[in-house]
Amino acid sequence: MELSLQNKVAVVTGGGAGLGQACALAFARAGAHVAICDVNESTITDTQAQIEALGVKAVGVVCDVSDADSVHHFFQTAEEELGGVDITLNNAGVAAPLTLLADTTEADFERVMSINLKGTWLGMRESLRRMLPRGQGTIINMASAMSKKSYPGSGFYTTSKFAVAGMTRNTAVEYANQGIRINAICPGNILTPLLKQSVSEDVQRQLAEAHPMKRLGEVDEIANCAVFLASEASSFMTGALLSVDGGWTAL
């Protein structure tokens, strides 16, 4: 099975920490040069150094994925400094407080949708405009297990990820005959550094119990799937929503 990304250029939004960082490092280990963006400059600097230590080129840009000009600048920089865009992982996203719909605010809605949905759309658009002239490219969107299953109180987050899933499938069909593959990863609860810091061990155990496998996922388990979807090993896959959730959505 061919999992090499040798000399490819991978672009990762939200690549400074968590799942984005894990995926960026996995792409680098597979041989890709990697461009990352994030809103936090310090995490960019650290992750960029880790990527370069793996013997590949790295670019880091501060970027607000909800802003079209900022996203354009990021992709333009990646293209100019690394020579193109072969792989895009639209990973940047935010959660929202658990709130029933009647109690939500317009500000909550705008924040979640502008980053999770608009940010993914902008990343896809910039990618396609660079990939289509070359007749090849792979786009991976970070959806969620909640793009397949309802979860009371998570309305805006769930809605944004359902929309990402729908946009993934629809756009995959639009460009399937032009050398572009577009898929999404749908993670369950993953033991990211942020989750470890912000959620008590008791709550972590409760989250683990909700999965049939009775544990939380590891960031590398998501990163491995990203490498698979970016590689020729998944060459006949497009429009797929890949569940990596310990069986949660199978319940």
Where is each model-derived feature located?
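Substrate-binding pocket helix/loop in short-chain dehydrogenase/reductase
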Residues: 99-101, 105-110, 195, 207
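Alpha-helical segment proximal to the catalytic Tyr-Lys
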Residues: 129, 173-174, 235
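A conserved structural motif in NAD(P)-dependent oxidoreductases
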Residues: 211-222, 233
